[in-house]
Amino acid sequence: MSLSLWQQCLARLQDELPATEFSMWIRPLQAELSDNTLALYAPNRFVLDWVRDKYLNNINGLLTSFCGADAPQLRFEVGTKPVTQTPQAAVTSNVAAPAQVAQTQPQRAAPSTRSGWDNVPAPAEPTYRSNVNVKHTFDNFVEGKSNQLARAAARQVADNPGGAYNPLFLYGGTGLGKTHLLHAVGNGIMARKPNAKVVYMHSERFVQDMVKALQNNAIEEFKRYYRSVDALLIDDIQFFANKERSQEEFFHTFNALLEGNQQIILTSDRYPKEINGVEDRLKSRFGWGLTVAIEPPELETRVAILMKKADENDIRLPGEVAFFIAKRLRSNVRELEGALNRVIANANFTGRAITIDFVREALRDLLALQEKLVTIDNIQKTVAEYYKIKVADLLSKRRSRSVARPRQMAMALAKELTIHSLPEIGDAFGGRDHTTVLHACRKIEQLREESHDIKEDFSNLIRTLSS
C-alpha cells in the first residue's frame, strides 16, 4: 500500500471540494496508516462529527479507487496522532493552502508556542468592557445553506480560540447574521473561560478610543488595553477606510494579538481585497486565517427564521403565513424580523388571529414597497437564488457557463427593470465595463429568441421581481 495514500486523498479532495470547505474541515486532519487502518485525527469532536457525517463516503470512495479490495478501514479519533512513530507509519498533509482562504505571508512573525488560553487571568482593568450581547448565541442562530460554513467556523473558534482560524473573517450584506455570530463566539468563549477578556466592538469605537487616547496623551494605555484581550471581535471593519492613523495602530495591534495566539474575528460587507481605502498589508493579513461569506438566506431558511422568532415570542405562526412573508421579503434577516414584530404587535393590539389576509393588511405598506422596489441588489439575489448559485459568483471573475449565463441574465434584467445606466450596472457587477453589460443584454436578447429555456427563465424572473 502506498505510503502517500492520504496525500493522494487530500489532492483529490482539494480538487473536488470548495476551497473554504477543504481548508475548514479536511486540512486540520492528521492521518496515520497502520495495520490496514487509516486513522484520522480531528482537533475536536465538532470537526470529527462533521467530517464523519459529510465526507465519510467521499473518503471511503477515494480509498477504494486507489486500493481496490485492499482499501484500509477508516477510524476517527479526537486529538493528535501519536508522536512516537516510524517514518513508514506517519502520513501527513502536504497540500498547498488555497490562496483565497488561508495565505501564509513571509513577513508574518511565527506564532508563540505558548498559548494564552492555558491560564486565563481575571480581568485586571476596572474599565474593561466586553459589550458581548448574551442574547445572541449559537442556539438561537438559525442555520441554513447560506450561513452554514460561517456558523461552523465561528463555532470552532469559540471552542478553540487562537487556533487554526485566526483571524476569522466573515463577510456579507447587511442584516445576514454576522454580528449575531460575533456575539455567539464571545458568549461561547466566556462560557468555557468565564475570566477570559473578550471585547466586541464596532470598528468606529476603535477609532474613537484611539482619538481619545491621542488627545489625552494615553496612547500607551490604549495599546496595552487592546493588546491584552484574549479575543477581539470587530464589526464592520470596512469603516477603517481612509483612516490612516487608525489603520497603522490596528496593524500593530493585529500583529501583537496573532503573535500571542489571541483570537481575532472581523466582519465586513465585502471580501477583504475589495475593501477600498484600506492598506494592502492589512487586507493581506485579513486573509491569513479563514475567510467565509454569508449569503442572503434562501426561502427555507427565511421560513425557519420566522418560525423560530415567533416561537421565542410564544406566538403560533401558521406555516403558510411564514411562507407568505418569506416569499415576499428576501433581502435579510433584520427585515424579516422587523416585519414579524409588526405582525405580532398588530395581533396583540387587535386580538385577531394571524392569517395571510391579516398579514397582508398589517404589512400593507411594506409589501407595496417591495412590489414596486426593484433594485440591482434585489435582482442579483433573485437571480442567484433562481440558478442556485451565490451572489458572490455573480460579482466574481468566474467565466464558466454556470456562472456567466446567470450573470448576463441579471445584467439584462437590471437594464430592463431599473433606471440605472450601463456603467452603473457594470459597477454593481464587480466593476465591469459598460460594454460588458451591453454585450450581456444583447446576448440574452438573442438567446430569448433561440432558446425556449432562456425565454422561460427571463419571464419567470421578470414575474418574480415584479410580483
Swiss-Prot record:
Methyltransferase keyword on record: no
Residues binding ATP, per UniProt: G175, G177, K178, T179
Q: Where is the composition biased (Low complexity)?
A: 98-111
Q: Return the GO cellular component terms, semicolon-separated.
A: cytoplasm; plasma membrane
> What Gene3D superfamilies does the record point to?
1.10.1750.10, 1.10.8.60, 3.30.300.180, P-loop containing nucleotide triphosphate hydrolases
Domain text? Domain I is involved in oligomerization and binding regulators, domain II is flexibile and of varying length in different bacteria, domain III forms the AAA+ region, while domain IV binds dsDNA.
Family assignment from sequence similarity: Belongs to the DnaA family.
**Record protein name field:** Chromosomal replication initiator protein DnaA
